[in-house]
Protein backbone atom coordinates (compact mmCIF):
# COMPACT_ATOMS: atom_id res chain seq x y z
CA UNK A 1 0.00 0.00 0.00
CA UNK A 2 1.52 3.33 -1.02
CA UNK A 3 1.87 5.25 2.18
CA UNK A 4 4.35 7.42 0.29
CA UNK A 5 3.49 9.34 -2.87
CA UNK A 6 5.05 12.01 -5.06
CA UNK A 7 2.79 15.02 -5.50
CA UNK A 8 3.66 18.49 -6.88
CA UNK A 9 7.42 18.04 -6.38
CA UNK A 10 7.04 16.79 -2.82
CA UNK A 11 7.13 13.41 -1.16
CA UNK A 12 4.00 13.00 0.97
CA UNK A 13 3.60 10.12 3.39
CA UNK A 14 1.46 8.62 6.10
CA UNK A 15 3.59 8.27 9.21
CA UNK A 16 2.15 5.08 10.78
CA UNK A 17 3.79 5.83 14.14
CA UNK A 18 1.55 8.86 14.72
CA UNK A 19 -0.98 8.87 11.82
CA UNK A 20 0.29 12.23 10.57
CA UNK A 21 0.53 13.33 6.98
CA UNK A 22 4.09 14.55 6.45
CA UNK A 23 5.96 16.01 3.51
CA UNK A 24 9.53 16.36 2.33
CA UNK A 25 10.98 18.74 -0.22
CA UNK A 26 14.49 17.25 0.00
CA UNK A 27 13.86 13.69 -1.19
CA UNK A 28 13.08 12.36 2.28
CA UNK A 29 16.10 13.65 4.18
CA UNK A 30 13.77 15.49 6.56
CA UNK A 31 10.00 15.42 7.12
CA UNK A 32 7.58 18.15 8.20
CA UNK A 33 4.15 17.48 9.66
CA UNK A 34 1.37 18.76 7.41
CA UNK A 35 -1.78 17.26 8.96
CA UNK A 36 -2.15 15.82 12.44
CA UNK A 37 -5.91 15.90 12.95
CA UNK A 38 -8.01 12.93 13.95
CA UNK A 39 -11.34 13.75 12.30
CA UNK A 40 -10.48 11.60 9.25
CA UNK A 41 -9.59 8.55 11.32
CA UNK A 42 -6.55 6.37 10.72
CA UNK A 43 -5.02 6.86 7.28
CA UNK A 44 -4.49 3.63 5.34
CA UNK A 45 -3.50 4.65 1.82
CA UNK A 46 -2.95 7.67 -0.45
CA UNK A 47 -3.10 8.18 -4.19
CA UNK A 48 -2.71 11.30 -6.36
CA UNK A 49 -5.71 11.62 -8.67
CA UNK A 50 -6.86 14.48 -10.93
CA UNK A 51 -4.85 17.11 -9.08
CA UNK A 52 -6.02 15.97 -5.65
CA UNK A 53 -4.85 13.47 -3.07
CA UNK A 54 -7.36 10.73 -2.34
CA UNK A 55 -7.05 8.94 1.01
CA UNK A 56 -8.71 5.87 2.42
CA UNK A 57 -9.07 5.75 6.18
CA UNK A 58 -10.95 3.70 8.73
CA UNK A 59 -13.69 6.37 8.46
CA UNK A 60 -14.01 6.29 4.65
CA UNK A 61 -12.68 8.12 1.59
CA UNK A 62 -11.36 11.68 1.88
CA UNK A 63 -9.66 14.10 -0.50
CA UNK A 64 -7.32 17.04 -0.24
CA UNK A 65 -6.88 19.74 -2.84
CA UNK A 66 -4.13 21.51 -0.88
CA UNK A 67 -1.39 18.86 -0.62
CA UNK A 68 -2.81 17.26 2.51
CA UNK A 69 -3.18 20.36 4.68
CA UNK A 70 -6.92 19.74 5.06
CA UNK A 71 -9.20 16.84 4.17
CA UNK A 72 -12.81 16.75 2.99
CA UNK A 73 -15.08 13.75 3.33
CA UNK A 74 -15.89 12.08 0.01
CA UNK A 75 -17.64 8.86 1.08
CA UNK A 76 -18.10 7.55 4.63
CA UNK A 77 -20.37 4.59 3.90
CA UNK A 78 -19.86 1.31 5.73
CA UNK A 79 -18.28 -0.18 2.58
CA UNK A 80 -15.82 2.73 2.22
CA UNK A 81 -14.70 2.25 5.83
CA UNK A 82 -13.43 -1.23 4.86
CA UNK A 83 -11.11 0.04 2.09
CA UNK A 84 -7.46 -0.68 2.79
CA UNK A 85 -5.88 0.34 -0.53
CA UNK A 86 -6.71 2.74 -3.34
CA UNK A 87 -5.19 2.97 -6.82
CA UNK A 88 -5.40 5.25 -9.84
CA UNK A 89 -6.54 3.07 -12.74
CA UNK A 90 -6.77 5.84 -15.31
CA UNK A 91 -10.43 6.60 -15.83
CA UNK A 92 -11.43 5.17 -12.46
CA UNK A 93 -10.25 4.67 -8.92
CA UNK A 94 -9.95 1.15 -7.57
CA UNK A 95 -10.22 0.26 -3.89
CA UNK A 96 -9.66 -3.06 -2.19
CA UNK A 97 -11.48 -3.97 1.01
CA UNK A 98 -10.10 -5.74 4.05
CA UNK A 99 -12.02 -8.88 3.00
CA UNK A 100 -10.65 -8.93 -0.56
CA UNK A 101 -13.46 -7.28 -2.54
CA UNK A 102 -12.68 -4.76 -5.27
CA UNK A 103 -14.68 -1.57 -5.80
CA UNK A 104 -14.39 1.09 -8.49
CA UNK A 105 -15.38 4.73 -8.72
CA UNK A 106 -15.73 6.87 -11.84
CA UNK A 107 -16.53 10.09 -9.95
CA UNK A 108 -13.39 10.66 -7.86
CA UNK A 109 -14.52 8.49 -4.98
CA UNK A 110 -17.98 9.93 -4.37
CA UNK A 111 -19.70 6.61 -5.09
CA UNK A 112 -18.34 3.08 -5.35
CA UNK A 113 -19.54 -0.04 -7.14
CA UNK A 114 -18.41 -3.55 -6.29
CA UNK A 115 -16.64 -5.20 -9.18
CA UNK A 116 -17.74 -8.78 -9.78
Describe the predicted segments one by one.
Residues 18, 28-29, 68-69, 109:
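Short coil turn/linker residues within repeat-based beta-strand modules
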Residues 17-21, 59-62, 99-102:
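Loop/turn residues immediately N-terminal
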Residues 100-116:
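Blade-level signature of beta-propeller repeat domains, shared across WD40, Kelch, NHL, RCC1
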Residues 1-8, 40-49, 80-89:
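Repeated scaffold domains used in trafficking and secretory/extracellular systems
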Residues 4-13, 51-55, 90-95:
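Entry beta-strands of beta-propeller and related beta-repeat scaffolds
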Residues 24-25, 64-65, 105-106:
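Conserved Ser/Thr-centered positions that define the repeating blades of beta-propeller domains
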Residues 31-32, 71-72, 112-113:
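Tryptophan-centered short beta-strand motifs
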Residues 35-39, 75-78, 116:
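Surface loop/turn motifs at the tips and blade-to-blade linkers of beta-strand repeat domains
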Amino acid sequence: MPQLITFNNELIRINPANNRIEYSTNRGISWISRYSGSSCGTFRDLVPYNGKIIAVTDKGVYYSSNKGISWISRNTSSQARTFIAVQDAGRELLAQTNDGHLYYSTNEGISWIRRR
